[in-house]
């Protein structure tokens, strides 16, 4: 698989790997994360599978399903997850901060890379997941777990360094 540097767009090569744990339901699984190094700028990047969010220990599906429940009106304390209430509250705060930022970044990416535009009016009144899904529908189909957060992070981390949901 070929990865381009999200900072400068140059080719990358294998650099290193590390072990990382991820909570999948009530289980803790250890996986190997590959790192690549840019041949242009020398920066290194972790190549995360789409079922892991950057800097998070819970699988993306657990995070997304929990956030969807809360966005649909469920109380934080009643979220269907093994994560603690304080962790869920942190997810909600971060999602509110990053969600619409990601929508804007994806719209810019869609315009710059694919010469496609999404009118702001089409996003008016949508909740964060609705806006993410509307924008993601305009992108080419990719092989993924089909979660909005995972798909958004694939596009963002491959084209824009430092931006993720």
Give the ranges of each region predicted by the language model.
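Short cysteine-rich clusters marking metal-coordination/redox-active sites
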Residues: 5-8, 38
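Short Cys/His-rich micro-motifs in 6-15 aa windows
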Residues: 12-14
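Basic, short loop/linker segments at the boundary and entry of helix-turn-helix/winged-helix-like folds
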Residues: 16-65
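Long C-terminal interaction/binding lobes of large macromolecular proteins
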Residues: 43, 101-165
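Short, charged amphipathic recognition helices of the HTH superfamily
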Residues: 70-85
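Short secondary-structure capping/junction motifs at helix and strand boundaries
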Residues: 75-78, 99-103
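Major-groove recognition helix of helix-turn-helix-like DNA-binding domains
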Residues: 82-101
